[in-house]
Amino acid sequence: MLIRLDKYLADMQVGTRSEVKELIRKKRVTVNDNIVTKPESKINTDGDSVNVDGNAVGYHEYEYFMLNKPAGVVSATDDNTCTTVIDLIKTNNRKDLFPVGRLDKDTEGLLIITNDGAMAHDLLSPKKHVDKTYYAKVKGKISDMEVKQFANGLFVDEELTALPAILKVLSYNSDKDYSEIHVTIHEGKFHQVKRMFTAIGSEVLFLKRITFGALPLDCLLYTSPSP
């Protein structure tokens, strides 16, 4: 792939676009052992050797981060009032990263951050029906009948009849009247899990995504607070 030298260096976190242009002008950058002074010079990412002050700078087109999103953080690239998931990637200066899908502000768990648009499309495409599993604490005791309702495809409201989902009851706390559950859905509608439990007369008290397709969140990271 051919790419401008200044973009190459900025993508690889050598500095901002203006900073790397200054490095180039000061003759601190070499390509294949030759000093290059034009920021617009084209670099072959598959074959050229780029060095800054004698240090090799390799290129990788795509980057992938698996994030355990905390509550209170928004699934966006930029926000004037709230911390975003991109803000949490503190060691990275790339400007083309984005979250694959979104989790509600109060929802925790697995979120993928990348600049790979093709992978994001495959994970989010409605035609793919990529599984997403959540751990939740929900109000009340979940019955076998409600498990079957989820399995048969739940009518949520006039805008949503959910595809068949797998609901597994883990435990019931009779003192505090809540159930711990795992639920696996095959689509990603707006507030879907919360709306599904509202439809059966329950309420989500805590929600954390623990798998996205074949990618699991480390089990040591998804303990939950008591409601």
Residue ranges and their predicted role:
Residues 1-80:
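S4-like RNA-binding module at protein N-termini
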Residues 16, 72-73, 119-121, 190-192:
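Short beta-strands and strand-coil junctions in structured, solvent-facing domains, enriched
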Residues 32, 112, 136:
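Residue-level signal for inorganic ion chemistry
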